[in-house]
Amino acid sequence: GVPCLCDSDGPSVHGNTLSGTIWLAGCPSGWHNCKAHGPTIGWCCKK
């Protein structure tokens, strides 16, 4: 999947590990939404 920036990763994508994965239809079972605001499309989820 496409990596995304979780709230716990830091304020910006520069120099931070992107620990989330974008899911277009919501987070699958066993995953949770790790970003409070965004992304614009889909959800940023992590295990």
Swiss-Prot record:
Disulfide bonds join C4-C44, C6-C34, C27-C45. Pfam families: Toxin_4. The keyword Secreted applies. InterPro entries: Anenome_toxin, Myo_ane_neurotoxin_sf. It is found in: Secreted; Nematocyst. Keywords: Cardiotoxin, Disulfide bond, Ion channel impairing toxin, Nematocyst, Neurotoxin, Secreted, Toxin, Voltage-gated sodium channel impairing toxin. SUPFAM superfamilies: Defensin-like. Its main location: secreted. The keyword Secreted applies. One of its GO terms (biological process) is regulation of signal transduction. GO terms for cellular component: extracellular region; nematocyst. GO terms for molecular function: sodium channel regulator activity; toxin activity. It comes from the Eukaryota. Belongs to the sea anemone sodium channel inhibitory toxin family. Type I subfamily. Binds specifically to voltage-gated sodium channels (Nav), thereby delaying their inactivation during signal transduction. Has a longer mammalian heart stimulation effect than Hk2a, Hk8a and Hk16a. This is Delta-actitoxin-Aspp1b.
